[in-house]
C-alpha cells in the first residue's frame, strides 16, 4: 500500500516559534510510519521557507532545516519545488504553526492556493477564532454562557480600571485578544497587578481584554479526529 505523504509545516513568525518546533517533532515521533511518510517544511522567523531532512538525536527523530525553498506550484501533485531537479509530493498538509501566521487563516490560505487538502480549520474559522473577543461574542449570540469581560484598546485609563473593578472584580485574567492561547495572558489578584499586566499584554497587541476568573472550573480539550 502506498504511503501518504504528510507535509508538516512548522516554525513561523510568531513568538510561539519554538513551541511549534516542539509540536512538529512530537508529531514526527508519533505518526504511524507504516501508513504515512512525513516531510517537514520549516518557516523561519523572517518568513523564509526551508525544506528539512529527518535526523535522529538522543534516540528521537527531529526535523533539521536545510536549504531555502525556491517556489510553490499551485495545483501540482508535487507543489513544493526545492530546485529544478527536486520537488516534494504532498498528499496532505499538516500546519502546526502556532499563533500569528499559523492559526489565523494565513497559512490555510496559502495551502488553499496550492489546491491541496490540509488538517485543521479552514481560513474563515481560523481567522474568527484567533480573535478571542469576536469568538466570545459569536458564542454568546448562540446562547452559550461566557465569562464577563471588559475590552481595552491601545491604552489604559483610570475610568476603565474602575469599570473592571466594578464589573469583573478580582481575581481576573488579562489576555491579548488576537494571539496564541498562552501569549500575553496574566492573572491579576489586585489593582496593582491588573495595571502591570495590562501594560505587559499591550506590549504584544493593541487589543486586550480582562476576563473574570472562574473558580473550580474544569478545562476540557476536544480533538476532532475526523469530520
Residue ranges of predicted features:
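Short, hinge-like loop/turn segments at secondary-structure boundaries
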Residues: 55-59, 137-140, 164-168, 191, ...
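Short, glycine-/small-residue-rich phosphate/pyrophosphate-handling segment
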Residues: 130-150
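ATP-grasp fold ATP-binding core
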Residues: 139-140, 165-185, 206-217
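Glycine-rich phosphate-binding loop signature in dinucleotide/nucleotide-binding domains
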Residues: 85-90, 167-168, 204
